[in-house]
Amino acid sequence: MDLFNILFVAPFLDMADSPVFLAEVIISGILTGVMYSLVALGFVLIFKASGVFNFAQGAMVLFAALTLVGLMERGVPVWAALGLAVVVMVVLAVVVERFMLRHLVNQEGIILFMATIGLAFLLEGFGEMVWGSNVKPLDVGIPSESFEIGGVLLNEFDLYAAASGSALVAVLAVFFHYTRIGMALRAVADDHQAALSVGIPLKTIWIIVWSVAGFVGLVAGIMWGSKSGVQFSLSLIALKALPVLILGGFTSIPGAIVGGLIIGVGEKIAEIYWGPLIGGAIENWFAYMLALAFLLFRPQGLFGERIIERV
């Protein structure tokens, strides 16, 4: 009974005793969740349009951020550097389509997955060769002043990050569901050959979706880089995005943001209220335990589609 009280009663009593502190923990979790969601969005876009799990998305986040901060270090103004970084990610999409995807059409998913692993190592190595491997501070002018509302401490950077993530999700949801290009992307994901037979240009569609994923990676890189500096550990954020995808569903854009928020808030609450009771570092494994529970009881995720195949 004592163990039950310690694990399942005491933490909730602590939350009730200090609602202001609880609110700060939740807000901190929301920021982290938005950051996870931005990375997960890149995975969703490519998987939704091509059925490929792009292991290189984390490396794309790193490469986009390295390109931006590298240009700024060489004296390029912020807005010009942003524009050039977008151009670089579009060029990357063209190169990926021309030299990788075009030669792997209709191959097994595992082959495409292995190809993206190779792409991840290529981007990391090329980024290190061109821009160096040291940690680079990134400042694009996003304010980071703190202020209080109702006793709750807020940060302007957190609000900008949350607003950017929400706006990006809304734009992408409209793009996929209400535009001709978006519908073509979904058609390609369902059946490459059928899409080609009705005149949908597969090469163009893949360039578009990888370009958009690159732009999403740039936004994620800006947020993560502004918070903790642009460093090569950014590429490992892909591992944290995987539980987000499992929770939200691999094909759901809203699911990416909801899954990210659940994991971000859950991590912070678990670390603050349960960490002192059962040991620290819960933040490092909480997301994976939650993802495992979803794989056991709801493998398609909160917003994913259950796939039924007749044999």
Task: Name each model-derived stretch.
Residues 43, 76-119, 126, 258-263, ...:
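Alpha-helical transmembrane segments within multi-pass membrane transporters and channels
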Residues 65-69, 86-92, 117-126, 164-173, ...:
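Hydrophobic core segments of alpha-helical transmembrane domains in multi-pass membrane transport
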Residues 36, 40, 76-87, 207-217, ...:
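Transmembrane alpha-helical segments in multi-pass inner-membrane proteins
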Residues 32, 153-233, 253-259:
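Helix-loop-helix "hairpin" substructures at the membrane interface of multi-pass membrane proteins
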Residues 14, 27, 49-95, 99, ...:
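Membrane-embedded helix boundary and interhelical linker motif in transport proteins
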Residues 3, 12-15, 103-178, 205, ...:
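Transmembrane helix-bundle core of multi-pass membrane transporters
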Residues 40-49, 68, 92-98, 119, ...:
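Alpha-helical transmembrane segments of polytopic integral membrane proteins
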Residues 1-39, 67, 75-81, 107-112, ...:
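Membrane-interfacial amphipathic/re-entrant helices at transmembrane-helix boundaries
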